[in-house]
Amino acid sequence: MASLRKTHPLIKIANDALVDLPTPSNISAWWNFGSLLGLCLITQILTGLFLAMHYTSDISTAFSSVTHICRDVNYGWLIRNIHANGASFFFICIYMHIARGLYYGSYLYKETWNIGVVLLLLVMMTAFVGYVLPWGQMSFWGATVITNLLSAVPYMGDMLVQWIWGGFSVDNATLTRFFAFHFLLPFIIAAATVIHLLFLHETGSNNPIGLNSDADKISFHPYFSYKDLLGFVIMLLALTLLALFSPNLLGDPENFTPANPLVTPPHIKPEWYFLFAYAILRSIPNKLGGVLALLFSILVLMVVPLLHTSKQRGLTFRPITQFLFWTLVADMIILTWIGGMPVEHPFIIIGQIASVLYFALFLVLFPLAGWLENKALKWA
């Protein structure tokens, strides 16, 4: 008789996804980030739940409630530090996961890839509304600046901004709804993750050489379950070290000051993981143009599968595109640096060049290099 895990309607689903899943035998550590993202999501939902038990979403008490969590709640300081720094690890894993997808041509699984881009947008949205909740100076002014961007929408912009604010400025109504969104979105992310996996398991995983691996598959458990476990240990160790030794390393000192609508901070900037997009936004002098560039800096990922010209899937055997890939990585680092710098010479021009290069790589240089490599191999 077949075992329960293969027959039980519910356990069978988990078995097919986590135990008996046929997996390419040669996938490297770059394939660990999917499960690490799952771990990040679970960690964030759990720590967030415990924070929500003590947090109050009212402008008169929000800041003090966070102080109360850190001072008076049992291990509240730890829960808060893990939650705040867990967001940074979430984005590190997301960017690594996307980079892996770009490098090895995983984007050719179009449904999985597009759901992934939607997931990225959802996570970015969640992080943004979450950053507003402590109601510090950078929370308030970050919310003001970013929500104000919607006023660039023609005809209905101003109405849209006031609708999101729930008034004529970022105020109590804004904080309350942002808390509601911040609580709800992670569960939508969890649901979208299930769809992401559903589409992935329709095709199976890609692998480093980009060839069909049906002839050489091994079961997920115990091989990759233990490999994932090693990744979990490394990431949790790194997160714990950051949360215990330098919890404020990645935060903004402005956020230790309660929100004050009458005092604007000298430099308004988002958390480090949004700086690249912020740099692209700022590099265009026109408001609507900047907003569109900001939006397209993420949505450009959706056109990557359509612009794939190479006869090979990944970049393992494609040196020209490899060079362009690492140029993209360097470009992202430069944009991140520029996003945190004041708007003055030479940062303005560096940001503009880096922004043009960012879009040129995705829309022109990658497809061109793929075509060129086909020609070089006489495959075209």
Swiss-Prot record:
Pfam families: Cytochrom_B_C, Cytochrome_B. Signal peptide: none annotated. The keyword Electron transport applies. Gene3D superfamilies: Cytochrome Bc1 Complex, Chain C. Binds 2 heme b groups non-covalently. A ubiquinone binds at residue 201. Heme b b566 binds at residues 97, 196. It comes from the Eukaryota. Keywords: Electron transport, Heme, Iron, Membrane, Metal-binding, Mitochondrion, Mitochondrion inner membrane, Respiratory chain, Transmembrane, Transmembrane helix, Transport, Ubiquinone. GO terms for cellular component: mitochondrial inner membrane; respiratory chain complex III. Its main location: mitochondrion. One of its GO terms (biological process) is mitochondrial electron transport, ubiquinol to cytochrome c. The keyword Zinc-finger does not apply. InterPro entries: Cyt_b/b6_C, Cyt_b/b6_C_sf, Cyt_b/b6_N, Cytb/b6-like_sf, Cytochrome_b, Cytochrome_b_C_euk/bac, Cytochrome_b_N_euk/bac, Di-haem_cyt_TM. PROSITE patterns: CYTB_CTER, CYTB_NTER. The chain crosses the membrane at residues 33-53, 77-98, 113-133, 178-198, 226-246, 288-308, 320-340, 347-367. It is found in: Mitochondrion inner membrane. GO terms for molecular function: metal ion binding; ubiquinol-cytochrome-c reductase activity. Heme 1 (or BL or b562) is low-potential and absorbs at about 562 nm, and heme 2 (or BH or b566) is high-potential and absorbs at about 566 nm. The cytochrome bc1 complex contains 3 respiratory subunits (MT-CYB, CYC1 and UQCRFS1), 2 core proteins (UQCRC1 and UQCRC2) and probably 6 low-molecular weight proteins. Component of the ubiquinol-cytochrome c reductase complex (complex III or cytochrome b-c1 complex) that is part of the mitochondrial respiratory chain. The b-c1 complex mediates electron transfer from ubiquinol to cytochrome c. Contributes to the generation of a proton gradient across the mitochondrial membrane that is then used for ATP synthesis. Belongs to the cytochrome b family. This is Cytochrome b. It comes from Carassius auratus (Goldfish). The gene is mt-cyb.
